[in-house]
Amino acid sequence: MGNTTSERVSGERHGAKAARAEGGGHGPGKEHKIMVGSTDDPSVFSLPDSKLPGDKEFVPWQQDLDDSVKPTQQARPTVIRWSEGGKEVFISGSFNNWSTKIPLIKSHNDFVAILDLPEGEHQYKFFVDGQWVHDPSEPVVTSQLGTINNLIHVKKSDFEVFDALKLDSMESSETSCRDLSSSPPGPYGQEMYVFRSEERFKSPPILPPHLLQVILNKDTNISCDPALLPEPNHVMLNHLYALSTKDSVMVLSATHRYKKKYVTTLLYKPI
């Protein structure tokens, strides 16, 4: 009896295994997904369309990151000129991906535009009165589509002089601002300056001090010609001097400059 029971239990187990084995071949169109993982099969949780961590899942993001790391080239102001006539002139090129037409401003007989172009080679073409044309007087190149375009090469060396002038102007402006903002030298304190009465109402001198040094009043050196006077100061020029009246004669003098020479004229008038 005991052997019969054990054989029956064993037969039931074999029947269950056989049923599971037969259930695996239901049809070619049905596919069972295993929900319980096994350490022996690393692809248990991998669906047919899933990607492994090593696949190119984030390639576009990585490309954008690489592009952002690249240094951007400095834009340089470039003059574009069209001198072949026309009523309306536009320009377009590889610098704006040929997306828009930039108008040129008429200046006398030419059309001019100043564009900020990055360093390197750029192809461009003019749109004159509704037709695409190129300037025959400028360098040309044939594009991949077989069209003839103008070619311009923007180089950093062409703008070194302008960069130096700009840097010098910035340094001079900073220096001038620093000089204007700096305080004058001298001791500083908390006491306010009090004006005295004689300082407040003191009038300026009748004659500036530098005009008191009249060259006609100076003694001439013995070794010099009496007709030659010492070189006057520039503040003495174009002023009228008068000598004190003596023997009923009035004497007037004035000094003028002619290029590198000075001439002093004396006028005598009896009164």
From Swiss-Prot:
Source species? Rattus norvegicus (Rat)
For the modification Phosphothreonine, which residues carry it?
Answer: T39, T147
Its ancestry begins with: Eukaryota, Metazoa, Chordata, Craniata, Vertebrata
| Any matching Pfam family | AMPK1_CBM
Question: List-wise, which residues carry Phosphoserine?
Answer: S38, S68, S94, S107, S157, S169, S173, S183
What cellular-component terms does GO give this entry? apical plasma membrane; cAMP-dependent protein kinase complex; cytoplasm; nucleoplasm; nucleotide-activated protein kinase complex; nucleus
Assigned protein family? Belongs to the 5'-AMP-activated protein kinase beta subunit family.
This protein's UniProt keywords: Fatty acid biosynthesis, Fatty acid metabolism, Lipid biosynthesis, Lipid metabolism, Phosphoprotein
TM ranges are none
Q: How does it assemble?
A: AMPK is a heterotrimer of an alpha catalytic subunit (PRKAA1 or PRKAA2), a beta (PRKAB1 or PRKAB2) and a gamma non-catalytic subunits (PRKAG1, PRKAG2 or PRKAG3).
Determine if Electron transport is one of this entry's keywords.
Answer: no
- The name this protein carries in UniProt is 5'-AMP-activated protein kinase subunit beta-2
Among SMART domains, the record links this protein to: AMPKBI
The gene from which this protein is expressed is Prkab2
The post-translation modification note in this UniProt entry reads:
Phosphorylated when associated with the catalytic subunit (PRKAA1 or PRKAA2). Phosphorylated by ULK1 and ULK2; leading to negatively regulate AMPK activity and suggesting the existence of a regulatory feedback loop between ULK1, ULK2 and AMPK.
Q: Name one GO molecular function term.
A: enzyme binding
